[in-house]
């Protein structure tokens, strides 16, 4: 069974709203894995692998999970992606994750890059084997056959 949780916002992306070490939305996502300390991976492709969201993800999940970050842009911001970063050369490591959390940005750019690198196929395989799929905005759109998007302007 495939488990998908899509969000319009919130969670670790908005710590000023909930002011808790782990937000209720993130706790819900983690609980869907059925593991006490799951392997969780942030994918920021839609936002160009900006370092800020990746760093917030790692900080938010450090005490409750085993966080990692996947980057397709090959950025090497010291301390941002962490020692367990997943790059274009080792994308198969996504299959080791209990949860994959995809951030927002451009749905069209995200899908194009995933297809180019074969990440879309790997994520389908991961989902079929029980990896929980989570996403916010474009990161939520990517799990479905169709969606509305602002990727092409208004």
Predicted regions and their residues:
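Extended, subdomain-level signal for the structured scaffold at the beginning of enzyme domains
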Residues: 1-108
């Amino acid at each position: 069974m495939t488990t998908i949780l899509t969000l319009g916002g919130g969670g670790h992306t908005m710590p000023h709203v909930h002011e808790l070490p782990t937000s209720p939305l993130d706790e819900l996502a983690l609980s869907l894995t059925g593991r006490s300390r799951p392997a969780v991976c942030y994918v920021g492709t839609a936002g160009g692998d900006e370092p800020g969201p990746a760093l917030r993800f790692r900080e938010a999940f450090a005490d409750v999970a085993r966080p990692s970050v996947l980057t397709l842009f090959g950025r090497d911001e010291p301390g941002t992606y962490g020692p367990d970063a997943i790059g274009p050369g080792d994308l198969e490591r996504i299959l080791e994750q209990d949860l994959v959390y995809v951030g927002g940005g451009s749905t069209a750019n995200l899908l194009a890059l995933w297809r180019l690198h074969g990440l879309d196929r790997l994520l389908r395989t991961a989902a079929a084997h029980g990896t929980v799929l989570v996403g916010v905005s474009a990161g939520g759109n990517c799990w479905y056959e169709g969606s509305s998007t602002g990727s092409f302007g208004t």
